[in-house]
């Protein structure tokens, strides 16, 4: 997400002590008085585990989205929610999880990322969840205490499970200002950590996971996931083109923080300028001397990379406020369909209330069902922009 503003979960078992200590560390000054915890409704999918806890918001001004940029309807509320899953996955479904901007979970020490991690492991086998893909803005201020909390919240994730990370603007620069590209990410998550999943194939820069390619054998086909840094530089795009060309036996999806806007068009500064808020080219990473690095917004990335490759079928991104959703289908140069998805929930209370996306590939090999679910609340959203299907051509497998 875009701004430059400031900014308890109960875990009883002794094995969780490290996580608890991080959660309690000097965070109260950032978020106000420590909130009490209230019992969440029992998630219908969580019968195998105790219900999650949802932290009440701090008293007074809320930690998270700064008051001066809140919309009149803040905090937003997802509509058409219910605990019942209307269309459970059929046998043979392949599932990917998308974890949009988690910055306020880290900044405010909310338990929702922990709840998401528990859910992924609890449902991994039953739902055939092959990987979880983050969409950047992992932290709010690129601060050690936030990275520590973020990492501790992922403790339930098994070493063999692919959890894919990349940077957003708030993961860069002093206090997440994106005035430059300095980040603490590599100090907490390195190649050795990523290789435990067995999916990491290569990185652009040794020791840095912001630009990385993963290969996941989902049984019916090989899925490639290309993770790209915030506002990819020209050198990054050159590397990405070479990678996708080398892995022509993979069907590839791309994840980057800022690509699609909330009106379901790509970020395009040359045509729309500041009309599209929070374009990557307006940040310090694209200003002054750094402008020579050739930063890309969505439309630039489409033309320089995405449209050129017949094996790319999907782009996912976050970053954008207001409705936080968008969907666009375009045709690549080879006639292939490329679907582009925006998902972000940080404008909800508590920075998102744990909502994530479940991207389910049905057994026909070409139809995806996109679902929105919160493990913290035990609720699905069936609003049209939260629950929908799309078809990939050519099919991923037959």
Model-derived segments and spans:
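Extended active-site neighborhood of metal-dependent phosphoesterases/phosphodiesterases
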Residues: 63-81, 144-239, 245-251, 277-282, ...
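Active-site environment of divalent metal-dependent phosphoester hydrolases
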Residues: 105-107, 140-142, 167-176, 209-212, ...
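Loop/turn elements at helix/coil->beta-strand transitions in domains of secreted/extracellular proteins
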Residues: 92-95, 126-132, 158-164, 218-224, ...
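C-terminal motif of bacterial Sec signal peptides marking the signal peptidase cleavage site
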Residues: 28-30
